[in-house]
């Protein structure tokens, strides 16, 4: 399987899982059950999770994934963002959508969805990425909402979810990277009723291996070896390690690894004023005259 075939296969799996998860999005469903279903289906369909299933409600924009024992359930009217990552041999599909639990789509959800559609329409080899930001910003503001300025899409490479280039959700002249044929990018507009910025809040439930570092604690060394071997430098969930060792030891090990820079932690991201947030995302391959949507 070559690179393009693997990217397309990962996208097909992500698309299928998005369809299947709809039946679980109803009041009373536990976030834990949704995340476990999504990640299990990815594996059953022949892929692997490229990152933990993110399930972020209302003012939480990103980086919430449930843990074992998490009793959070969906309530009617919740804005649930489901962000799914699949990889096939390291080639990644990253996609997201927003549901209003038990209710019809409203203008906030429509604004984010249309921002994604309009952004994809401008993509082709040779454009500057600020043209994507312009399409997103104009669409979201046209509905009377704010784009989240400190969240962005991203270039993707093999085993690299964020490959150094950010795809903005607003127009900035300085965003002058020119798209090349064959670039793989994730476009992910976030629309909010709030101020249009996110802040980090504890706890971190998602982590990523960065580098080997000497650590005192034997349990920390064990965790480091395990995550390096298992996840190929892609993000992993605290939930995936629950049961690997006693909970208290695991928390201490992760804290030590984070402190010495062996791992990166992803704090939960909340809209600064507590505004509601909607998100949509596709992964696309840049072509000469357009974009091939893999997801």
Swiss-Prot record:
Optimum pH is 7. Keywords: Aminopeptidase, Hydrolase, Metal-binding, Protease. GO terms for cellular component: cytoplasm. NCBIfam families: met_pdase_II (TIGR00501). This is Methionine aminopeptidase. Its EC number is 3.4.11.18. PROSITE patterns: MAP_2. It comes from Thermococcus onnurineus (strain NA1).
């Amino acid at each position: 399987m070559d690179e393009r075939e693997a990217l397309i296969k990962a996208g097909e799996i992500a698309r299928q899982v998005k369809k299947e998860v709809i039946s679980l999005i109803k009041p009373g469903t536990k976030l834990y059950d949704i995340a476990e279903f999504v990640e299990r289906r990815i594996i059953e369909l022949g892929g692997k999770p490229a990152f933990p299933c993110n399930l972020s409600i209302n003012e939480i924009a990103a980086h919430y994934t449930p843990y074992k024992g998490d009793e959070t359930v969906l309530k009617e009217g919740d804005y649930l963002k489901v962000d799914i990552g699949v990889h096939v041999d390291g080639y990644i599909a990253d996609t997201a959508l927003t549901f209003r639990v038990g209710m019809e789509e409203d203008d906030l959800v429509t604004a984010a969805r249309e921002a994604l559609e309009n952004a994809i329409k401008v993509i082709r080899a040779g454009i500057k990425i600020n043209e994507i930001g312009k399409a997103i910003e104009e669409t979201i503001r046209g509905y009377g909402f704010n784009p989240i300025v400190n969240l962005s899409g991203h270039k993707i490479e093999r085993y690299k979810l964020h490959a150094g280039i950010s795809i903005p959700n607003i127009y900035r002249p300085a965003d002058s990277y020119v798209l090349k044929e064959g670039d793989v990018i994730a476009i992910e507009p976030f629309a909010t009723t709030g101020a249009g910025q996110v802040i980090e809040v504890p706890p971190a439930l998602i982590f990523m291996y960065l580098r080997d570092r000497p650590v005192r604690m034997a349990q920390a060394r064990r965790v480091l070896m395990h995550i390096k071997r298992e996840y190929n430098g892609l993000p992993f969930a605290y939930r995936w390690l629950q049961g690997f060792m006693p909970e208290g030891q695991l928390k201490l090990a992760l804290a030590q690894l984070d402190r010495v820079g062996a791992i990166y932690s992803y704090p939960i991201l909340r809209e600064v004023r507590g505004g509601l947030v909607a998100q949509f995302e596709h992964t696309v391959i840049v072509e000469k005259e357009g974009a091939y949507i893999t997801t």
